[in-house]
Amino acid sequence: MSTKPIPEGYHSVTPVIIVKGATRLTDFLKKVFDAKVLMSYSGPNNTILHSEVLIGNSRLMIADAGPVFGAQTGSYYLYVDDTDAAYQRALAAGAKSEREPTNQFYGDRNASVVDEFGIRWSMATHVEDVSHEEMERRMKAMAPK
């Protein structure tokens, strides 16, 4: 039996978030996106050396910042079943609103929040299939005159 270059359950790209407070970030993701903890390895002083959570069908690796790797965050776009509900859960979990739920010209209803670590979480529900031609038309209509 040969070993696969990408392990079972992983995708070609797996985001890694490193923060001071990995446990708090994991709690936020569980509350907002129903994240499931797949594995977690503890380090000294109640830190997380490495953990993996599953959000929908995608893995996210999380760790506490330390002397080897400092904080590394980013911006993430997640598809969810209900943008409005996820947005409300994010606010209830302490995130700050960046954009309220809105239907976008490209067919997604999305919103974005920023958590206590400065991570931008954009959540979206695809509500309309938009052809390439229609998207171009809508973009031109939105362009400044």
What are these regions (language model features)?
Residues 7-9, 16-59:
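Core segments of cupin and vicinal oxygen chelate
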Residues 9, 40, 76-78, 105:
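Intrinsically disordered, low-complexity N-terminal regions enriched in serine/proline/glycine
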Residues 43-46, 68, 104-105:
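A short beta-turn/loop motif at secondary-structure boundaries
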